[in-house]
Curated annotation (Swiss-Prot):
Functional summary from the UniProt entry: This is one of the proteins that binds to the 5S RNA in the ribosome where it forms part of the central protuberance.
Assembly mode: Part of the 50S ribosomal subunit; part of the 5S rRNA/L5/L18/L25 subcomplex. Contacts the 5S rRNA. Binds to the 5S rRNA independently of L5 and L18.
Domain of life: Bacteria
Protein's UniProt name: Large ribosomal subunit protein bL25
Record carries keyword RNA-binding: yes
Key word Calcium present: no
Xref: HAMAP family: Ribosomal_bL25_CTC
Family: Belongs to the bacterial ribosomal protein bL25 family. CTC subfamily.
Organism: Burkholderia pseudomallei (strain K96243)
GO cellular component, one term: cytosolic large ribosomal subunit
InterPro entries linked: Rbsml_bL25/Gln-tRNA_synth_N (IPR020056), Ribosomal_bL25/Gln-tRNA_synth (IPR011035), Ribosomal_bL25_b-dom (IPR020057), Ribosomal_bL25_C (IPR037121), Ribosomal_bL25_long (IPR001021), Ribosomal_L25_dom (IPR029751), Ribosomal_uL5_bac-type (IPR020930)
Keywords, sorted A to Z: Ribonucleoprotein, Ribosomal protein, RNA-binding, rRNA-binding
GO molecular function, one term: 5S rRNA binding
Amino acid sequence: MEKHMKVVAFERQQQGTGASRRLRNAGKTTGIVYGGEAAPQMIELDHNALWHALKKEAFHSSILDLEVAGKSQRVLLRDVQYHPFRQLVLHVDFQRIDPKKKLHTKAPLHFLNAETSPAVKLSSAVVSHVVTEIEIECLPADLPEFLEVDLSKIEAGQSLHAKDIALPNGVALTAHVDAENPVIASATIPAGAVSDEAAAGEGETPAA
């Protein structure tokens, strides 16, 4: 049986700025659950538990099992509002999912094998990750926790694009990402290294 991360929340009766401030002072964070055929639902969550959950990548990219008043529903985390300078979560948004409808979301990218690539081993290039997530569409049951990007064959001066990602069955890039095919990683030789190589070449004395 497929398991999902569980989130426990409580129905929120009071609304407004004053009520939200009182909840924060009591160690709670406000939230909302929307989508599907049910009406939007105001909720509150334990702040510390939520703070630690938000540090996990899977919490942002996986289907969650949200329990409110003893009833469970499948949701995706859609938005998080943080305090501008304090370690404080102000508000979270969850969206209900329909197992029969495709969803659009962002999947984290995990870059692998850069250190064994020709770009790094042969050219001392620097491999840069241009993006760290990509927009995809799939049915909820096919949602990957992350996507792997194999950099083992990248050479200096080359770039990898979105269409180079090996997508699991049932997963596709969203239409606009597929059309734009953006760069996701590139391998470049640092300017200093190029200058050093040129200087070394100029300093060599031709053989008599």
